């Protein structure tokens, strides 16, 4: 019935939001600890940021797929 559909949609929204918050928290905590200084540090940092962003997107997609 309609109440169940709303509850299910809301639960999915909450799960997605929690996953996004978790990934954001991971990215924020990892960013503070990744301060390595070397000649190609900027390039390495940009690649690391890209890979972290991609991993976060993949993780959220995996959570949304319901295979957890």
From Swiss-Prot:
Q: Key word Repeat present in the record? A: no
Q: Where in the cell is it found?
A: Secreted
A Pfam family that this protein carries is Hormone_2
Q: Name one GO biological process term.
A: response to starvation
User: Which Gene Ontology cellular-component terms appear in the entry?
Assistant: extracellular region
Is Transit peptide among this UniProt entry's keywords? no
**Bilayer-spanning residue ranges:** none
Induction profile: Produced in the A cells of the islets of Langerhans in response to a drop in blood sugar concentration.
Gene3D superfamilies in alphabetical order? 6.10.250.590
Q: Which UniProt keywords apply?
A: Hormone, Secreted
InterPro entries associated with the record: Glucagon (IPR015550), Glucagon_GIP_secretin_VIP (IPR000532)
Tell me the protein family, please: Belongs to the glucagon family.
General function of this protein: Promotes hydrolysis of glycogen and lipids, and raises the blood sugar level.
Q: State any further remark.
A: X's in the sequence were included by homology with American goosefish sequences. Gln-14 is a unique substitution from leucine in other known glucagon sequences and glucagon-like peptides.
Report the protein name in the record: Glucagon-1
Source organism: Oncorhynchus kisutch
Q: What is the lineage of its organism?
A: Eukaryota, Metazoa, Chordata, Craniata, Vertebrata
């Amino acid at each position: 019935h309609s109440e169940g559909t709303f509850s299910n949609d809301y639960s999915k929204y909450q799960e997605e939001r929690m996953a996004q918050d978790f990934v954001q928290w991971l990215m924020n905590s990892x960013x503070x600890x990744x301060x390595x200084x070397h000649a190609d540090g900027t390039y390495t940092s940009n690649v690391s940021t890209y890979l972290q962003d991609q991993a976060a997107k993949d993780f959220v997609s995996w959570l949304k797929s319901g295979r957890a």
